[in-house]
A protein has these predicted regions:
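Short, flexible, basic/aromatic active-site loop/helix in glycosyltransferases
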Residues: 142-164, 168
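N-terminal glycine-rich phosphate-binding loop and ensuing alpha1 helix
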Residues: 1-59
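Residue-level signal for inorganic ion chemistry
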Residues: 7, 33, 90, 105-106, ...
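Conserved alpha/beta core of the MobA/IspD/sugar-nucleotide pyrophosphorylase nucleotidyltransferase superfamily
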Residues: 161-233
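Hydrophobic packing residues within well-ordered alpha-helices of enzyme cores
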Residues: 16, 61-65, 120, 173, ...
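Residues at the starts of beta-strands that form the adenosine-phosphate
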Residues: 47-49, 128-129, 203
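Conserved N-terminal catalytic core of the sugar/cofactor nucleotidyltransferase
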Residues: 34-99, 183-184
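Conserved beta-loop-beta/alpha segment of the NTase-like Rossmann-fold superfamily
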Residues: 75, 81-143, 163
Length: 233
C-alpha cells in the first residue's frame, strides 16, 4: 500500500487582500508552500507527492521543486476553479491505483507536523477516510440564512474544527464524487463532506490535529504563523 501526499495550492487567496497568492508568501525564509511540502517530503511514510496549482504557476512551482531537490514530487498538476476540482485532478491521476492512500493537505497550513501525518497514515489502516480535527473550544450557534438571529446552540462537546490533511483510499474518494455528480444539487465544501453525504456507509475517522496547524486565510495570520514558527513546539 502506497501513500501519496497531495498538496492543494491552486487557490487565489483573495481573502488575504494581497496581490500574491498566499501559498507563495514568504514565511521564515521560505514560501508558505515550501513549508507544507517539505514536511510531507521529509516524512518516511510518504511515498510520493503531487502538487496541484493554478495553471499560471506551474512553471514557478516546478522551479521550486527543482531548487529543493524534492524527488518525491511526481507531478505538478493544474488545479480547477473550485477546491474539489483540484482534488479530483489528483484523484484521477491515481485511477489505476484504487488502494492508494491519498492525504490531501492545504498548502496554506504550513505548520502541519510530522506527528499529524504519522497519525493520519496509521488511522488509514482502520478507516477508508479520515479527517484531522481539533475539539471546538468556543460555543457554536446556528443562525438564520442571513445571520440576523440565532436559531439554536450546538452541543460543543460533539463539535470539532476541521483541519487537513484529509485522507482517503483512492477508490473511496473517486466513488464519492461519482455519486455526487449524479446529484443536480451537489455543492462541495470539502472532500470529507462529499464522502459523508454520498457514501453514508463509510465511516470517516478523526485524527487529532493541533492548534498550531492553522490555515493562512487573512493577512494578519502571517504574523501569528511567524510567531508559531519561531516558538518552541
Amino acid at each position: 500500500m502506497s501513500t501519496v501526499g497531495v498538496i492543494l495550492a491552486a487557490g487565489s487567496g483573495s481573502r488575504t487582500g494581497l496581490s500574491t497568492p498566499k501559498q507563495f508568501l514568504p514565511l521564515g525564509g521560505k514560501t508558505v508552500l515550501e513549508h507544507s511540502v517539505q514536511t510531507f517530503h521529509n516524512h518516511p511514510g510518504i511515498d510520493e507527492l503531487v502538487i496541484v496549482v493554478h495553471k499560471d504557476y506551474i512553471d514557478q512551482v516546478q522551479s521550486i521543486v527543482k531548487q529543493n531537490g524534492w524527488n518525491k514530487v511526481k507531478a505538478v498538476l493544474p488545479g480547477g476553479k473550485e477546491r474539489f476540482d483540484s482534488s479530483l485532478v489528483a484523484v484521477r491521476a491515481y485511477a489505476d491505483h484504487p488502494d492508494t492512500v491519498m492525504l490531501f493537505h492545504d498548502a496554506a497550513r504550513p505548520l502541519v507536523s510530522e506527528r499529524i501525518i504519522t497519525d493520519a497514515i496509521k488511522a488509514m489502516e482502520r478507516f477508508d477516510a479520515i479527517d484531522v480535527a481539533i475539539p471546538a473550544v468556543d460555543t457554536i450557534v446556528q443562525c438564520d440564512k442571513d445571520g440576523t438571529y440565532m436559531t439554536s446552540i450546538q452541543d460543543r462537546s460533539l463539535l470539532w474544527r476541521m483541519q487537513t490533511p484529509q485522507g482517503f483510499r483512492q477508490r473511496v474518494i473517486e466513488q464519492a464524487y461519482n455519486e455526487a455528480f449524479k446529484d443536480p444539487r451537489f455543492t462541495a465544501t470539502d472532500d470529507c463532506g462529499t464522502v459523508l453525504r454520498y457514501l453514508p456507509g463509510v465511516k470517516v475517522g478523526i485524527v487529532r490535529g493541533s492548534e498550531r496547524n492553522i490555515k493562512l486565510t487573512y493577512a494578519a495570520d502571517l504574523s501569528l504563523l511567524e510567531f508559531l514558527l519561531s516558538a518552541p513546539k
